[in-house]
Amino acid sequence: MSHQSELIAGDILEYLSQHENKDMLRFITCGSVDDGKSTLIGRLLHDSKLIFEDQLAAIERDSKKYNTTDQDIDLALLVDGLQAEREQGITIDVAYRYFSTDKRKFIIADCPGHEQYTRNMATGASTSNLAIILIDARRGVQTQTRRHSYIVSLLGIRHVIVAVNKMDLVDYSEDVYNRIRDEYLTFAEHLDIPDIHFVPISALRGDNVVSRTEAAPWYQGATLMHLLETVQISHDAPLSAFRLPVQYVNRPNLDFRGFCGTIASGAVHPGDAVVALPSGKESRVKEIVTFDGSLSRAGAGQAVTLTLEDEIDISRGDMLVRADEARPHVSRSFDAHLVAMGEAPLRPGKEYGFKLAGKYVTGRIEAILHRTDVNTLQDSPADALALNEIGLCRISLNSPAAFDAYRDCRGSGSLILIDRLSNGTVAAGMIVAQSEEASPAALSPWALFEQELDQLLQRYFPQMTRAELARRLRDEL
């Protein structure tokens, strides 16, 4: 590695201890095509001296063939790994890179800028705490800038750094920078992004990325790296109530029965009264078990196994919550924003598999309430959602599930839709709220029969649809 830590050479155990105790920041870079996203990541790694010497040699060699800049080294090649990306000078897939500084660990997701790769960007943004939105100083706020900002807001990212890139091409003009800042802030009034920072940079030359530049003396703010190291993300989760989606029931012998999962929010202690949802059965936490031994407390992000004082029926897909805290919704129906990811359009009425925090259940899209144009943010009616389109949909499940709004808790408010024939992921969703369900008294006898039939199929033949059942009955008769 070009950068050698004295601590690594002197005391490897102390280095590992410090590294383990650093907090983690996940962020994405997004913006219009050729705004310099991959170059910026390469510059962050290069100027932080976090590139291996063999990597640097390989980039120098590849730059002679694929260089898209006037520099000796094209730093974008550190991230653009696919051959098609290098040949076209664009990003297609989401590329992840990992690095750390003295203050924090980072995971970067370099997302594609093209509209046809909206699903790729949604994937990268779904786990991020912060977004860097690049704007070309020569072009200003573009349609793709608005689209990416909308997706960032939709996916609950609360921190945005707007990096006005290529300032060297406009002679570091303060007027250009101020105009872009004001235009973006006017647009962002319609979005739910509470924390926005601006920084003028040149990713190609490294100005204001890791080190300050004297070329823009009018800018007295922090560098991009300083903002990344100091942004506060510990209070981002609005939900403080305990949520443990059960991923696995561990029963190695007759004397042990534990419920495994990663805590989505809140904290739990031995002795806490808990409720299993959707059944509503109550018990108390007997022990918090981990590989390193029992714990006196476990919090969000920790993978644990809980044992309970009572033998109650809990299965994979159920959710454990504390009895004295706010509970999630338990319902068969909710509204959610869906991002279409499959080649075939999403259509109301078709049976899909739904995966919510480890729970798999079948159901359907009851209605598409509206489709949102990600470029203009205008809503319009729609009968289907094609690849990369986003819409607000009403979902109806065949059995009840526990969930929160995505804004309150990502872990219990997100879902994916699965094609039941190919098992491919056809959409990702963010739950908005529980929708109004029809009461049983308001349903017709035929609708009640369909509900009970769906429940029986889900219980005994989970891969079979009503149409398949009807076809089999016709064949046998």
Swiss-Prot record:
Domain tr-type G: residue ranges: 22-239
GO molecular-function terms, A-Z: ATP binding; GTP binding; GTPase activity; sulfate adenylyltransferase (ATP) activity
Transmembrane segments: none
Source species, domain of life: Bacteria
Region (G1) location: 31-38
Chain spans, region G3: 110-113
An example Gene Ontology biological process: hydrogen sulfide biosynthetic process
Location of region: G4: 165-168
Keyword Lipoprotein tagged: no
Reaction catalyzed: sulfate + ATP + H(+) = adenosine 5'-phosphosulfate + diphosphate
Annotated spans, G5: 202-204
Family (UniProt): Belongs to the TRAFAC class translation factor GTPase superfamily. Classic translation factor GTPase family. CysN/NodQ subfamily.
Matching PANTHER family: TRANSLATION FACTOR (PTHR23115)
Quaternary structure annotation from Swiss-Prot or TrEMBL: Heterodimer composed of CysD, the smaller subunit, and CysN.
Full protein name: Sulfate adenylyltransferase subunit 1
Provenance organism: Chromobacterium violaceum (strain ATCC 12472 / DSM 30191 / JCM 1249 / CCUG 213 / NBRC 12614 / NCIMB 9131 / NCTC 9757 / MK)
Phylogenetic placement of the source organism: Bacteria, Pseudomonadati, Pseudomonadota, Betaproteobacteria, Neisseriales
